[in-house]
C-alpha cells in the first residue's frame, strides 16, 4: 500500500487530476482520418513524462482493438508514431511485443534516440528484441561506444588487396613480392565517430546498409510554402 500510495501521489495535484479525469483526445479515431496529434513534454522536468508513456500505451491498445473489431485487421489510414527523445518518456509496457504486432494493423513506431544504450538502460534485455523488430534503422551520427561497436559489426567487412615488397642486399641482391587478400571493416568505430554531419547510414530489412546524404528539409515543398507565406506576410510596398 505504501508503494502504491507513493506511485499515485502525483495525482494529488488538482490540475493533473483534471487533465486525466475525462477522455478528450479520442485516440481511437486517429486511424479513421488524417490527423496530427502532438504530445509535447518538458525537456528539463521529467515529473510528468509518464503521461506520454500512458498515452502511447492507450493509443496502441485502442487502435489494435479497433483495427481488429471494426476494420477487419487494418486501419484505413496509416498511423505513424514519431517518438522523439523516446528514452525520456519512460517505459512503454510490452513495447517489445507491440512493435512486432502493430505493423499488420497499419501502425508504425519510429523511436528517436541519442544513443542505443539509452534503449538498453530502459528496456534491459528486451532492447535487442525491439531493435530486431524494426524494419528500418538510421544512424545520424554520434560517439557512444556501444552504438559505434554494434554498427561497425553490422556494416561488415570489405576485401582489400595488399602487396608487400622486400629487398635484401649482400653479396647478392634479392627481391620478394607477396600478394594477399585481407578483410577490412567497411567503416571502423573511429571512422563512424567522425562521419560527415551531412551523411547518414540507413539499414533496411533485406538490403545491405548504405551511406546516404541527409535530406535538406528546407527543400521540402511544405517548407517552401511556409517560407513563401512568411515572406508575403512581411512584404510592404513602403519598404
What is the predicted function of each stretch?
Residues 1-107, 122, 190-214, 220, ...:
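P-loop NTPase motor domains
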Residues 28, 34-35, 97-100, 118-226:
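P-loop NTPase motor core of the ASCE superfamily
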Residues 87-88, 117, 232:
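Short, glycine/acidic-enriched loop or turn micro-motifs at the edges of active sites
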Residues 113:
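H-loop/switch region of ABC-family ATPase nucleotide-binding domains
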Residues 224, 228-239:
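Positively charged, low-complexity/disordered segments
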